[in-house]
């Protein structure tokens, strides 16, 4: 008897809707999830900066800012954490349930890291809570130690775009 192994297939837009609306009962939760992601990004930068001094050479005042434009119906959450490159965007945002924080913890443990930073994210789905209140989500990011900035955008239709590379200093 011949057997064949197949991969599961999914209707991504419907799966995202199911995940987001099943996990979170209150729309306000999206803000907590996005702030948690920003906090983890800062903690990762601080931790890596202990051994990679060039990552924190600009002596940042770590922080998260939230700006709301009611007339444009937009909210912008800004942090000065570790940032992401194109590969990170694809892996962390373009792959549902892929936790960058979980992968970071695992890599540190494999290197023998004992004093691991207190990071919040674990499951790789909190970011998608933004779709409870937004039709479109855009992430603009630059990984510390690099000059390339990237934009990732999705309307939860199942497709996303990791595009618009731009080289900037700082």
Please name every model-derived segment:
Residues 1-170:
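GHKL (Bergerat-fold) ATPase N-terminal catalytic module, capturing the glycine-rich phosphate-binding loop
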């Amino acid at each position: 008897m011949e057997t064949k192994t197949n991969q599961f297939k999914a209707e991504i837009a419907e799966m995202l809707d199911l995940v987001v609306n099943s996990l979170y009962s209150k729309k306000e939760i999206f803000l907590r999830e996005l702030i948690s992601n920003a906090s983890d990004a800062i903690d990762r930068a601080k931790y890596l900066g202990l051994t990679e001094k060039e990552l924190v050479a600009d002596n940042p005042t770590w922080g998260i800012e939230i700006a709301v434009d009611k007339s444009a119906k937009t909210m912008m959450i800004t942090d000065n954490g570790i940032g992401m490159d194109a590969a990170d965007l694809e892996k962390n945002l373009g792959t549902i349930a892929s936790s960058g924080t979980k992968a970071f913890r695992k890599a540190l443990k494999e290197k023998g890291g004992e004093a691991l930073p207190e990071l919040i994210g674990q499951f790789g789905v909190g970011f998608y809570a933004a779709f409870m209140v937004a039709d479109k989500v855009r992430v603009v990011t630059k990984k510390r130690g690099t000059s390339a900035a990237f934009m990732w955008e999705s309307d939860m239709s199942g497709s996303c775009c990791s595009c618009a590379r731009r080289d900037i200093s700082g």
